[in-house]
């Protein structure tokens, strides 16, 4: 079955992840992510209790992300191929929290596919932008990717931090991703 607004390659990404012979999940727990964000914001020192970083930041944990719309504009050889997408965020109960609208550009195809990503996430309490370069091959092996996040409006305005992204359910079509966002 093809969903008209999602490119078939995106729908099959979970199947590709299931076929990977090297599965190496490396989740970064939310406390470690908060320490990194608080250190980057100058609100935390290495000597501080790691758990204290959680109190200094806005933490969005146990989010699920999946494609609602994904369009690929192919280029010969793959490099320069662009992707436009709208992703849905749900909480642990399956309640829709908002969307991320963004784009990606394929930077390199071999031996790993590297992509530049930029998106703006709109939630009821504000928005933030995520930017970074991710290793899609590593992601198919269920390795966690980290993007830089900057608050744009609402309770996120003026704050910065990080977002993690990892395939959580490759059996879904499109696959579901586990997301954590921490801004300080």
Swiss-Prot record:
Homodimer. The lineage of its organism: Bacteria, Bacillati, Actinomycetota, Actinomycetes, Kitasatosporales. Its EC number is 5.-.-.-. This is Spiro-conjugate synthase. Coiled coil: none annotated. Involved in the biosynthesis of the spirotetramate antibiotics pyrroindomycins. Catalyzes the intramolecular cyclization forming the spiro-conjugate moiety in pyrroindomycins, via an exo-selective [4+2] cycloaddition reaction. (1S,3R,6R,8R,9R,11R,14S,15S,19R,20R)-8-ethyl-9,15-dihydroxy-3,4,6,20-tetramethyl-21,23-dioxo-24-azapentacyclo[20.2.1.0(1,6).0(11,20).0(14,19)]pentacosa-4,12,22(25)-trien-25-olate binds at residue 115. The keyword rRNA-binding does not apply. It comes from Streptomyces rugosporus.
């Amino acid at each position: 079955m093809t969903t008209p607004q999602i490119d078939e390659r995106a729908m099959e990404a979970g199947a590709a992840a299931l076929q990977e012979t090297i599965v190496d999940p490396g989740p970064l727990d939310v406390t470690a992510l908060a320490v990194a964000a608080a250190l980057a914001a100058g609100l935390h020192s290495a000597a501080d209790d790691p758990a204290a970083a959680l109190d200094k930041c806005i933490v969005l944990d146990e989010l699920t992300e999946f494609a609602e719309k994904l369009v690929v504009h192919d280029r010969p050889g793959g490099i320069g191929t662009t992707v436009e997408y709208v992703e849905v965020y749900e909480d642990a109960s399956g309640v829709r929290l908002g969307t991320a609208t963004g784009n990606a550009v394929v930077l390199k195809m071999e031996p790993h596919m590297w992509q530049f990503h930029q998106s703006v996430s709109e939630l009821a309490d504000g928005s933030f932008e995520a930017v970074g370069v991710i290793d899609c091959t590593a992601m198919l092996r269920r390795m966690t990717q980290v993007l830089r996040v900057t608050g744009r409006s609402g309770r996120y305005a003026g704050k910065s931090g990080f977002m993690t992204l990892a395939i959580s359910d490759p059996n879904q079509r499109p696959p579901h991703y586990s997301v954590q966002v921490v801004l300080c």
